[in-house]
Amino acid sequence: MNFYMKYLLSTALIALLLVSCHKEQNAFEQSPSERMKQQRTALQNELTEAPYGWKVLYFPRTDSLLFATPTKAEKRSDSRYVEKLLNQGFGGFYFLMTFHKDNTVSIQADTYSQTIQTAKTSEYNLSQEAQLQLSFTTYNYVHQLVNNRFRAAADWLYVGKDTLQNIVFKTASYADPAREYIVFEKLKTSEDKQQFLQKAYNNRLFFEQMQNPQIVIKRGSKIYYQSDVYLKGNSFGLNTPFLEGFVANRYYVFEYRTNPQEDPSTGRYRSQFIGSGYVGTEKGLTFRAGLRYSHSLIFYDFVRQGNRFVAEHRDSKGIATGYIAEIFDN
């Protein structure tokens, strides 16, 4: 390499370093308050520049450990079992939210037909101290969950984005993971906006109106778990408040008798349980913290196929493992 070429190369490298240092210097020249203001403005722009609004999935109070060991059989007559069922976990809710630049938000909810059709307009605020926070400052459908049952919150802390570029929030209620779930997904078409909440409601209602919902977990022809107890019947001593809790709390438990020869009328047989909170989606059902067969085999999202809900298990890399879970009315 001759002297002239070396000179040009050195000059280019020096210029590149100077530009890089200048950019870095500009970043550090911003004060913390300026950076926070920039982040707040960016989030507000993103929320308000979604012409069709946002699908918001909110599980305010999940419990990943309530039925976390289904392969461990429990006595149905055990007081701990009864306490777990009567104090079962809680499911989620689906909202349609449309944010406006005047700090108002229109919200529809999946609770009833009326809440799907009737939007409530309330005020919201984006503030930032230690963390960027979205607060619903006047009453809307979210506040209906701020009670002793669901223990929801109307102040949501911005976490960031997931791998699908959905916006993720949390609340200050829990430090532990898997205790709540708040995800915003941008709606892409006016048709989605008009239909997704009604479809989600219909799928949830279809599941809740099943007379004898059961689940089977299988891989090929091999069955790993198949529930077989008729929980909605009266022959096993389940009282009305317990059954009402399934729907009111949006939580369901599937039960499998480990010894079919035991008399079910005694209530003293041993069973294995799988349970989780749920919500209807436009495609089917979503369970959080998931229907768990083992620590690595957990089913979350079920697609409605005719009269069944089917979930295909995938590993941490998104590769199908061959395990399938199906919920059906037996």
Language model: regions and residue ranges:
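C-terminal motif of bacterial Sec signal peptides marking the signal peptidase cleavage site
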Residues: 17-20
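Short linear motifs in intrinsically disordered
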Residues: 43-46, 96-98, 156-160, 297-303
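A structural detector for beta-sheet-dominated domains
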Residues: 57-59, 98-100, 108-110, 127, ...
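Long, acidic/polar, low-complexity amphipathic helices and coiled-coil-like
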Residues: 103-233
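Preference for solvent-exposed, low-hydrophobicity sequence contexts
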Residues: 187-330
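Sec-dependent signal peptide recognition
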Residues: 4-11
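Acidic/polar, low-complexity intrinsically disordered N-terminal segments immediately downstream
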Residues: 22-123, 127-131, 190-215
